């Protein structure tokens, strides 16, 4: 089992963790239906960029 040789300070630990923060998902509202969806993704009812692209 690995054991550290020297103690890492709180500052070093927190500097390492500075890149671990989560970001929120970019959500858009469709022009025609007003439905929220992820950016660059088709909505649940098949619209993309205001056009119907998938027929159910």
Curated annotation (Swiss-Prot):
One GO term (biological process): translation
Organism for this UniProt entry: Actinobacillus pleuropneumoniae serotype 7 (strain AP76)
Gene Ontology terms: cellular component: large ribosomal subunit
NCBIfam families: rpmF_bact
Compositionally biased region (Basic residues): 7-16
Family: Belongs to the bacterial ribosomal protein bL32 family.
Membrane-spanning ranges: none
Gene3D superfamilies: Single helix bin
Entry keyword Mitochondrion: no
Keyword Cell membrane assigned: no
Record's keyword terms, sorted: Ribonucleoprotein, Ribosomal protein
Alphabetized GO MF terms: structural constituent of ribosome
Domain of life: Bacteria
Name of the protein this chain belongs to: Large ribosomal subunit protein bL32
